[in-house]
């Protein structure tokens, strides 16, 4: 079911999104990673992480990771999306180039597993900035919050992104939520003042996202009560 959601949403969003170019990185062919041993906190008081997700053969493949007790088979595995960790604990990062060697791939896989496990071990909501690469030079940043209490990933849609970014980035994000965080649901946070809000609501409603009341206990914990009326919330429950 999630495969259907990803493909349908990416196709529709590719036709609907009209915006400025997304951010660029000056790295062309090298893989990058940065890390920090100290934990950082967001303005909302949550621990904060920055994770990079990349697509295509330019990036290394994941290796099977240990799963938690609520292990499930992922219907998105055939996409074979590639992932990497950009920063373990801070949103600002220093980049270091790594050669495409087997030892580097092994190190990155171990590093990724450790960071994901650290996120899953957090007892309170955790902020995750997802840097979703479309090419080695282009990416979009999606701000999310993972709530371990309800096992939900809350996603703020970027204000601007290109057709290509909207298609591939959302697929990568859904895969990350289902395969890495093993979420039970994804909640989208859509600002009411967006010009493309009607199209977004129709798109996500078509593939199974349902409205969530701002007063619902499933509403995002990271948005202040007085600001929740500025957003529309839509939830999709991930089937096991």
Curated annotation (Swiss-Prot):
Preferentially expressed in adult female midguts. Residues 18-45, 69-95 are annotated as: Disordered. GO terms for biological process: positive regulation of protein catabolic process; viral translational frameshifting. It holds the Pfam family ODC_AZ. It comes from the Eukaryota. Residues 21-33, 85-95 have a biased composition (Polar residues). Residues 34-43 have a biased composition (Low complexity). GO terms for cellular component: cytoplasm; nucleus. Residues 69-84 have a biased composition (Basic and acidic residues). GO terms for molecular function: ornithine decarboxylase inhibitor activity. Interacts with ODC1 and thereby sterically blocks ODC homodimerization. Ornithine decarboxylase (ODC) antizyme protein that negatively regulates ODC activity and intracellular polyamine biosynthesis and uptake in response to increased intracellular polyamine levels. Binds to ODC monomers, inhibiting the assembly of the functional ODC homodimer, and targets the monomers for ubiquitin-independent proteolytic destruction by the 26S proteasome. Belongs to the ODC antizyme family. This is Ornithine decarboxylase antizyme. It comes from Aedes aegypti (Yellowfever mosquito). The gene is Oda.
